[in-house]
A protein has these predicted regions:
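Structured beta-strand-rich core segments of catalytic domains in phosphoester-bond hydrolases
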Residues: 2-4, 12, 21-22, 34, ...
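Active-site beta-strand/loop signature of hydrolases that rely on acidic residues for catalysis
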Residues: 6-13, 25-57, 83, 118-121, ...
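Extended, low-complexity, polar regulatory segments
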Residues: 28, 231-266, 272, 287, ...
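N-terminal, active-site-proximal structural segment of metallo-dependent hydrolase catalytic domains
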Residues: 1-59, 325-469
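Metal-dependent phosphoesterases centered on the DNase I-like endonuclease/exonuclease/phosphatase
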Residues: 149-288, 330-335, 402-419, 426-434
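Glycine-rich phosphate-binding "P-loop"
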Residues: 9-21, 140, 148-156
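Conserved beta strand-loop-helix elements of the APE1-like EEP
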Residues: 76-91, 120-124, 230-231, 275-291, ...
């Protein structure tokens, strides 16, 4: 069994056609991972969208990470991959039930089919192989506004709840739990609390840096702490900032990037104030056996491309060392372990405060009302356009001129097309979204019941729930 091993997570920013120098950067990412000493044993990648880029990274890291899985999801792919020193025994892709809207095509979250890449890896070599690591790599829905005005906060909260449930299930089986990725949340936010509490895991960074920042220095949540604006070096070493750092060239203004593209060497003093940097990438860890612990954690992949002089991604990596620091608490009592596994004692999750459950339920209620209004408007638009289209077709018969008939037909065609699209979204997508919200709401109500009374709600009687969606 492995005494210690390294893990790494990185958002590669590999958007096809959109990310600049994609091929060169992702190829170099593979080279940098392969040159690490000590090398990582498990790597989780996000925004690795193309098979070509995945293969380039696999080729560069084959000698240290001979096993890997590229996960397929959605229309354009979820961009998730897991690489491993040891064989991947089981694997699956779990898509999030709530994940953006198709109307936000310019954002793409719905089209890529975001979810959780799951892998079961048994660590160690030869006869000493034993413990199973449940690896989860994810990329949560992006926040396009600040909370609480973010219209997607309900989706991101549901996603945090969903991955936390997967983590809790792995914990209940006595496995080592590793959830890594770009969670698009700040520390101690609602989603963060859900993953830690409902998922029964610990934020690896806060284990070693409990007083680290809980947002960018310019954010209200951080200003209330009354701490001075940190410099770039402090943000990396103490705050774990992986995004929006002044050291990352992709966060520079257009003027600086143009100078860089012309071959000019631009350096940034690590003592430069860094008010916008924040931590969006995480490693969550749990071990029900208390056998392994996180002994070190750091921000990595901060180097630049050797020829382009750009950062390798718009995010930095998070890296951690897991070490066997003690004997399993059930090493001398395997029967007790078997009893706890079969009785479900490991599955007794921690509970969030009742007020938190209530706030989530209020969020769901508000969002559900919003989506019902959206559905009514979209279906009304479809009905109105259908009426207009029929009117235009009738008017063609009395049209005195050909060009007037052409304009009526054009109006009918374009208007009805827009109406049909709105009707499909309102009738099909929103209906599906409302059903997913019902499932999420039931989960939260059930968890609240356990937190309050110690018992789940169970199935309600017919008529207790609103079946109309």
């Amino acid at each position: 069994m492995a005494e210690s091993f390294r893990v790494l997570t990185l958002n590669c920013w590999g958007l096809k056609y959109l990310a600049k120098y994609r091929n060169e950067r992702l190829s170099q990412i593979g080279t940098e991972i392969a040159s690490q000493d000590p090398p990582p044993a498990i790597v989780a990648l996000q925004e690795c969208w193309t098979q070509q880029d995945y293969n380039a990274i696999r080729e560069a890291t084959q000698h240290i990470l001979p096993h890997g899985k590229f996960y397929w999801s959605g229309i354009f792919g979820g961009g998730l991959a897991i690489l491993s020193q040891w064989p991947i025994e089981e694997s699956k892709m779990v898509r999030y039930a709530l994940n953006g809207r198709p109307t936000a095509f310019f954002r793409g979250d719905w089209f890529v089919g975001k979810g959780v890449a799951c892998a079961k890896i048994r660590i160690g070599d030869g006869p000493e192989r034993g413990r199973v690591v449940a690896v989860f790599s994810t990329h949560l829905h992006a926040p396009y506004e600040t909370e609480p005005n973010d219209s997607y906060i309900c989706h991101r909260t549901a996603q945090a709840w969903e991955i936390a449930g997967l983590m809790r299930s792995a914990y209940a089986k006595g496995q080592i739990v590793l959830a890594m990725g770009d969670f698009n949340m700040i520390p101690l936010s609602l989603a963060h609390k859900i993953v830690e509490t409902h998922g029964r895991a610990s934020d690896a960074w806060r284990l070693h840096h409990p007083d680290s920042s809980i947002g960018a220095a310019i954010d209200t949540v951080e200003k209330t702490r009354g701490v001075p604006i940190p410099d770039a070096a402090y943000n990396l070493s103490e705050n774990g900032a992986t995004c929006d750092s002044v050291l990352n060239t992709w966060r520079w203004n257009k003027g600086q990037q143009k100078r860089l593209a012309k071959g000019e060497t631009i350096t940034v003093d690590p003592s430069t104030k860094d008010p916008r940097a924040k931590r969006l990438d995480y490693i969550f860890f749990a071990d029900a056996m208390n056998e392994y612990s996180v002994t070190s954690v750091n921000v990595g992949m901060t180097m630049r491309h050797p020829t382009l002089q750009t950062s390798l991604s718009d995010h930095f990596s998070v890296e951690a060392t897991l070490e066997k620091t003690g004997k399993s608490r059930f090493a001398d009592d395997p029967q007790r372990l078997a009893q706890m596994l079969t009785s479900g004692e490991f599955d007794r999750s921690n509970h969030l405060p009742v007020e938190t459950y209530d706030s989530i339920l209020a969020m769901i209620t508000d969002y559900e009302a919003r989506e019902r209004r959206q559905r009514r408007l979209r279906l009304s638009h479809f009905g109105a356009q259908l009426t207009v289209a029929i009117g235009c077709l009738v008017a063609v018969w009395w049209s005195p001129r050909n060009f007037v008939a052409f304009l009526l037909m054009l109006l009918s065609t374009l208007g009805l097309s827009a109406g049909v699209i709105d009707g499909l979204i309102g009738g099909l997508f929103v209906g599906s979204e409302l059903r997913a919200l019902k499932e999420f709401e039931w989960d939260i109500r059930n968890a609240r019941g356990v937190a309050v009374a110690g018992e789940p709600l169970g199935l309600r009687k017919p008529g207790d729930e609103d079946d109309d969606v």
